[in-house]
Swiss-Prot record:
Keywords, ordered alphabetically: Cytoplasm, Lyase, Schiff base
Location within or outside the cell: Cytoplasm
Pathway(s) the chain acts in: Carbohydrate degradation; 2-deoxy-D-ribose 1-phosphate degradation; D-glyceraldehyde 3-phosphate and acetaldehyde from 2-deoxy-alpha-D-ribose 1-phosphate: step 2/2
GO molecular-function terms, A-Z: deoxyribose-phosphate aldolase activity
A GO CC term attached to the entry: cytoplasm
Name of the protein: Deoxyribose-phosphate aldolase
Amino acid sequence: MDYAKYIDHTLLKPDATLDQIDKLIDEAKEYHFKSVCINPTYVKHAAEALKDSDVLVCTVIGFPLGANTSATKAFEVEDAVKNGADELDMIINIGALKDGRYDEVRKDIEAVVKASGDHTVKVIIETVLLTDEEKRKASEISKEAGADFVKTSTGFAGGGATVEDVKLMKEVVGDDLEVKASGGVRNLEDFKAMIDAGATRVGASAGVQIIQGLESDSDY
């Protein structure tokens, strides 16, 4: 198994500097990670730096709360794609989901999918804030709305991916969607557990440590 191709090498901290982004990019090129996952302000820079590589540019939409309007999320997508983003990790409207306003949740995802064109859309459902039934419903709605992935977490809500959540999400979406595990994957053992549970992508700032079999103290 080529572990690197499962990893979105991630730096989403609000205080991330250009030097840190460049380090992330260099590591991604060296280890041939699937993508770098970065905030939208760095997409254009990353796309230019990675244009002759096999590393994709992934960015986040409505991050980290998911509480933007659908129109705002759609504009973020259009801007990110224009700047060179290949993949888009959006956050659902979590409050709407918990209220049972499922049409609103679905239309929010659909707005992002439509704006993305043929680009990959991953839907972050923020599992740490949901009951198991809400996780199932969010995964079902993501499938109905035409997303490509369901994703566990932002890493900013006090919890990350668990094996149990990945299994639950995969059970719901089956082969129709892929599952991305993110948040708290700090070493090769964690990584393998997520893959065994059904994830086909792992978001982690510890990509290098995972590949090297080391341990990271990062929360994402």
